[in-house]
């Protein structure tokens, strides 16, 4: 069976990744892409890798009826347009933060409130490794934040294996590429200002903390740095377990959680150049790399995870979740394994 799909907000970076994935997906027919600023231009005008397509951007006011609508719009748009989205499609996958959290109180604390709070309990978080069963048949799906996704994937096995209880001190440092700022950018995203930086841009209070709290049930000390790469999110989690932990315990926890997951790979101190997770290794793919190292002298466990922020942290996660929701093979349209060697991701 072939499902029709549309992308609302298709001219941005994440929208472009959605268009790329859907264009090559064996079970989706890309029916529409909207952009207010690029209306009537071909999608290749914004995304040169899609110049082969004749599809043109249409107005977001003229939504066509499709099976699945992917919304790659700024925060606040989807909650205002959700009625139109759901009228146009049986399944809506939102890539903004509008439906990620479970309660109105959380949006009051972390964002600027929510205009459609009754829909929050109907939404399902899009990370299949965390929420697969609830995604099956879901009609409103919220793709997770890239920094939260990297952190959750790194820490989840430790909680599932009861290595951590939630009372431990956990310090998370995330380094992200410039594409996280979107195609619109701003002064801080211009090449002269961004090139060569290791810039703390959210030392405390990053909104993705709310997702980590919600799904792992913990508070973390969370800091995000902007670094000189285009794609990628790399999370380094410093954990101080209350109990003694061995390498065997860790291998058992991570293999037990991820051995059957098609998009998560364990990379933990092996040979070669790429001994631990790196964004460069997963650029352009829906894969996540997860690894760890023990520091027994300081009673510390260091957990690493790396994803492409626009793929596993956004568009790839969204398509993966849609596959699960519709009963499509999970890896469909997401088989690309990346390139090596490559330049800065």
From Swiss-Prot:
Q: Any S-S bridges, and between which cysteines?
A: none
Question: Which Pfam family name is an example for this entry?
Answer: Semialdhyde_dh
Superkingdom of the source?
Archaea
Q: Which GO terms describe its molecular function?
A: N-acetyl-gamma-aminoadipyl-phosphate reductase activity; N-acetyl-gamma-glutamyl-phosphate reductase activity; NAD binding; NADP+ binding
Part of which pathway?
Amino-acid biosynthesis; L-lysine biosynthesis via AAA pathway; L-lysine from L-alpha-aminoadipate (Thermus route): step 3/5; Amino-acid biosynthesis; L-arginine biosynthesis
Enumerate the Gene Ontology biological process terms: arginine biosynthetic process via ornithine; L-arginine biosynthetic process; lysine biosynthetic process via aminoadipic acid
> Region annotation Disordered: residue ranges?
34-56
Kind of enzyme, top EC level?
oxidoreductase
Q: Does the keyword NADP apply?
A: yes
Indicate where this protein resides in the cell: Cytoplasm
Query: Residues that bind NADP(+), according to the entry?
Result: 11-14, 309
Q: What is its EC number?
A: 1.2.1.103, 1.2.1.106
- Which residue positions are annotated as catalytic? 146
Q: Which UniProt keywords apply?
A: Amino-acid biosynthesis, Arginine biosynthesis, Cytoplasm, Lysine biosynthesis, NADP, Oxidoreductase
The record's GO CC annotations read: cytoplasm
| Classification via NCBIfam families | argC
Q: Which family does it belong to?
A: Belongs to the NAGSA dehydrogenase family. Type 1 subfamily. LysY sub-subfamily.
| Protein name per Swiss-Prot or TrEMBL | Putative [LysW]-L-2-aminoadipate/[LysW]-L-glutamate phosphate reductase
Q: Which organism is it from?
A: Haloarcula marismortui (strain ATCC 43049 / DSM 3752 / JCM 8966 / VKM B-1809) (Halobacterium marismortui)
**Gene this protein is translated from:** lysY
């Amino acid at each position: 069976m072939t499902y029709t799909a549309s992308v609302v907000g298709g001219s941005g970076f994440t929208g472009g990744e959605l268009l790329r994935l859907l264009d090559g997906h064996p079970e989706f027919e890309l029916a529409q892409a909207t952009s207010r600023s690029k209306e009537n231009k071909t999608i290749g005008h914004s995304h040169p890798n899609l110049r082969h397509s004749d599809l043109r951007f249409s107005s977001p006011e003229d939504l066509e009826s499709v099976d699945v609508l992917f919304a790659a719009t700024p925060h606040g748009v989807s909650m205002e347009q959700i009625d139109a989205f759901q009228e146009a499609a049986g399944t809506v996958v939102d890539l903004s933060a509008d439906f990620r959290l479970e309660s109105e109180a959380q949006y009051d604390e972390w964002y600027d409130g929510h205009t459609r709070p009754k829909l929050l309990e109907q939404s399902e978080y899009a990370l299949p490794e965390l929420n697969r069963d609830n995604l099956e048949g879901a009609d409103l799906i919220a793709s997770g934040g890239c920094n939260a996704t990297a952190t959750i994937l790194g820490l989840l096995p430790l909680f599932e294996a009861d290595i951590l209880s939630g009372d431990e001190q956990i310090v998370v440092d995330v380094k992200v590429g410039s594409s996280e700022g979107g195609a619109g950018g701003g002064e801080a995203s211009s090449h002269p200002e961004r090139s060569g930086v290791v810039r703390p841009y959210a030392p405390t209070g990053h909104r993705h903390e709310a997702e980590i709290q919600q799904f792992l049930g913990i508070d973390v000390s969370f800091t995000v740095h902007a670094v000189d790469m285009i794609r990628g999110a790399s999370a380094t989690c410093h954990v101080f377990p209350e109990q003694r932990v061995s390498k065997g315990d860790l291998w058992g926890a991570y293999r037990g959680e991820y051995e059957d997951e098609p998009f998560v790979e364990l990379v933990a101190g092996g040979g070669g150049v790429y001994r631990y997770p790196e964004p460069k290794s997963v650029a352009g793919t829906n894969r996540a790399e997860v690894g760890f190292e023990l520091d027994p002298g300081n009673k510390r466990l260091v957990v690493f995870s790396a994803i492409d922020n626009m793929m596993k942290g956004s568009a790839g996660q969204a398509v993966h979740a849609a596959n699960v929701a519709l009963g499509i093979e999970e890896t469909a349209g997401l088989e690309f394994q990346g390139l090596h060697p490559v330049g800065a991701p």
